[in-house]
Amino acid sequence: MDQERHEFSIDWAGRTLSVEVGQLAKQANGAVLVRYGDTAVLSTATASKEPKDLPFFPLTVNYEERLYAAGKIPGGFIKREGRPSERAILTSRLIDRPIRPLFPDGFRNDVQVISIVMSSDQDASPEMAAMIGSSLALCVSDIPFEGPIAGVTVGRINGEFIMNPTPAQLAESDIDLTVAGTKEAINMVEAGAKEVPEDVMLEAILAGHENIKKMIAFQEKVVEVCGKEKREVQLKTFDAELEARLRESAEASIKEAVRIAEKHARQDAIDEIIAAQVEQHSDDDSINVDEVKEILQMFVKEEVRRLITVEKIRPDGRGVDEIRPLSSQIKLLPRTHGSGLFTRGQTQALSVCTLGALGDVQVLDGLGIEETKRFMHHYNFPQFSVGETGPIRAPGRREIGHGALGERALEQVIPSEQEFPYTIRLVSEVLESNGSTSQASICASTLAMMDAGVPIKAPVAGIAMGLVKQGEHMTVLTDIQGMEDALGDMDFKVAGTANGVTALQMDIKISGINREVLEQALEQAKQGRMKILSNMMEAIDKPRAELSEYAPKILTLTINPDKIRDVIGPSGKVINKIIEETGVKIDIEQDGTVYISSLDTAMNQKAKQIIEDLVREVQVGETYHGKVKRIEKFGAFVELFKGKDGLLHISQIAEERINKVEDVFKLGDEVDVRVTEIDNQGRVNLSRKVLLKEQREKLEKEEAKDTANE
């Protein structure tokens, strides 16, 4: 039966946001079309009828960009959208993180949330429209969901917070913050900032939450009218009798095992307990072996959380605000442009910095207005880092997300293109993992850039904070390790310099957190960050003064934009000839800035001289040292510089009359001449006569002066 179409609207951050329900995608469990400005996003939510036999909740969130939304045709031969862009992947994660904690515990039905950008207005964020659409699609559906949630982007210009700023406003802003949450609490934060103090970041988060409350109230009105009755679902529960039996036989030994400080020894002890219990119950056909494993893992989680919240004891024995042992090194790889190794306990990251010409920038093909990217940070997480085997695949969402977080943290201190005309690529290889690998990669990448001689504004370090909340007990943890991340309630990553925050990322597994928790986490993170920066500065306290001998050397010059065509030549013949002669790379900007790069400084200079000669303009009144290239009866043609000749008329060769040019010059002679005129046709007239006259008069004055002195 057709649903009735409903439309709702609200003024949100200075633009109209409207929601349409009941017209599109009616076979989905829930579907809404969100319009924000000229942006239009269709969000749908569907769920399987039966639960899956899995130990986790199978939720998939996809944010899909259609290039027709921006009036573009995809590039390449196939001419259709391929794999999602990095921006689309990051937005999918951005939507997934705040909605995932709001499904019922034990819910195992397959849920898929899809948002398709159908019209893109760069001044009206499609990401925020998709987040609201995803929340509403779930809320109006029959899928169990404890929403709604909403998200907002917060900027700050001249000390004032701006909600959902335009790209132009974000360029001026010192904060680019996305915050999401429910009516009661915040449950997701993602931010980049220009060394902003912690208290300002906190106020920005809270300002965003106030705006979120208005959007949630709007969604609740939509759900009142359009919401379906929630279906009855089968939640996964454990057999009470089996749980009691396992608690009696294994709980005590598990409590001992989780107190083992070393990661692998602790995990081996837990694995042995689980294997013994599985063996003990394997003959009983009424018992599901997988359920035995899940119950025992639940006991591990309970004990770890109890120790942290009640006894303030961490799995490795550290204090709640204690950082694991630190180590920082540089220059491990001699042929790379820069390298840094950062180790924190059993987490280790090796980062390599590579410098390239501006022609090496990444070209972006998406809905965004940004066409290229000069600074890149890539993150790799091989299986050996956790002592396991596994297939080697292309980077997944996690790797892309961690790489982007590091990029956001570091790009705030990258020098401008004018200060440092290089493309910068960082690759972080995680060699050991026991939590906080993304933050270790930030530290290692800072070391690598300083080793490479990149003049960063300040060193950046990152640290991951955790939270475990059990009943009335709550503990904020500094520098969480793998087990604390997996079994805790919050992963709050904070990166920054000694002056302030450059990036934040917060994910939580509970419904939300309040101001007090955020304040405490930010303060502990600041203290931890300062300790880490101190350790890093022992390895290298400032960027190297010179680049690696293996890094390209770049020369910069500026030419008249009207002369760019002279440097490029017809079909690129001129510029290709220069490149062939010198072996350099040449990049020319529309404003006339020319970048010449190669490993050979001499070849850079040669290419620069060729280009300067090509674009050099003759100036009337200037004196040039030229060469006679052609002799005619009426005068000599003199090459002033490559590509530019002038006529030295026979009457302008000498002060006295001469009969033949050949009486004074032969081909190849070098001569000083002055430009006396450039006519309407661009022809250059020269004179040697005026220079000879000036020299004679100067000599006569000096002789007269000498005579007077006698």
Curated annotation (Swiss-Prot):
Pfam families, sorted: KH_1 (PF00013), PNPase (PF03726), RNase_PH (PF01138), RNase_PH_C (PF03725), S1 (PF00575)
EC nos: 2.7.7.8
Cofactor list: Mg(2+)
Keywords noted in UniProt: Cytoplasm, Magnesium, Metal-binding, Nucleotidyltransferase, RNA-binding, Transferase
GO cellular component, one term: cytosol
Subcellular location: Cytoplasm
Biological process according to GO: mRNA catabolic process; RNA processing
PROSITE patterns xrefs: KH_TYPE_1, S1
Boundaries of every S1 motif domain copy: 621-689
Domain KH, chain residue ranges per copy: 552-611
Family affiliation: Belongs to the polyribonucleotide nucleotidyltransferase family.
General function of this protein: Involved in mRNA degradation. Catalyzes the phosphorolysis of single-stranded polyribonucleotides processively in the 3'- to 5'-direction.
Name this protein carries in UniProt: Polyribonucleotide nucleotidyltransferase
